[in-house]
């Protein structure tokens, strides 16, 4: 996708609260949405159809279904994003404006577009899990000092088996 002109900034900032309170797939979706947001106001009017295209999945994954909230509802539930529907006063013409809260010093991660360019072929959940791990690293490093694994699970809101699945060496290694 490097050859494709995408409306992305070179990097974005994400609140650790946003990262840690969404599931893995939604973390990556939010990261991609933030890449399209204005760097000062953190606002974007990217459509869910556009976002699905950037992430490489179907639009249906963003809609409410039996037993799951829509992507927008999940974002709202974090308290980190204000979502407004804007009506253009024309028939069948409206759009959604997303405004992410400004990040708090020491409680965010700066994530480059390089992450998108390099890892966009990995499984969506794995991309989100990498971002979740990144959110618990020491500032300006990639060192995770949380131990035992139970503390990590609690911090990133993930189950024990999932953490072990992604952090333990493969039997094939």
Give the predicted meaning of each segment.
Residues 1-57, 80, 84-151:
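Short recognition helix of helix-turn-helix/winged-helix DNA-binding domains
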Residues 60-74, 159-165:
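Short amphipathic alpha-helical interaction segments
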Residues 152-153, 159:
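C-terminal terminal-subdomain/extension
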Residues 166-173:
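Conserved small/polar residues in nucleotide/adenosyl-binding loops
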């Amino acid at each position: 996708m490097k050859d494709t002109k995408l409306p992305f900034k070179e990097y974005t900032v994400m609140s650790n609260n946003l990262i840690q309170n969404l599931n893995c797939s939604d973390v990556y979706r939010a990261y991609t949405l933030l890449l399209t947001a204005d760097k000062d106001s953190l606002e974007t009017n990217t459509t869910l159809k556009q976002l699905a295209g950037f992430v490489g999945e179907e639009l249906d994954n963003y809609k409410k279904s039996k037993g799951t909230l829509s992507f927008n509802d999940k974002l709202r539930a974090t308290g980190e994003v204000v979502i407004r529907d804007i009506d253009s006063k024309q028939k069948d013409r409206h759009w959604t404006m997303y405004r992410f809260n400004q990040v708090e010093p020491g409680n965010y991660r700066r994530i480059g577009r390089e992450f998108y360019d390099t890892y966009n072929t990995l499984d969506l959940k794995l991309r989100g899990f990498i971002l979740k791990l990144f959110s618990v690293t020491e500032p300006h490093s990639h060192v995770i000092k949380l131990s035992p694994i139970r503390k990590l699970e609690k911090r990133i809101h993930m189950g024990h088996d999932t953490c072990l699945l992604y952090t333990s060496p493969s039997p094939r290694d």
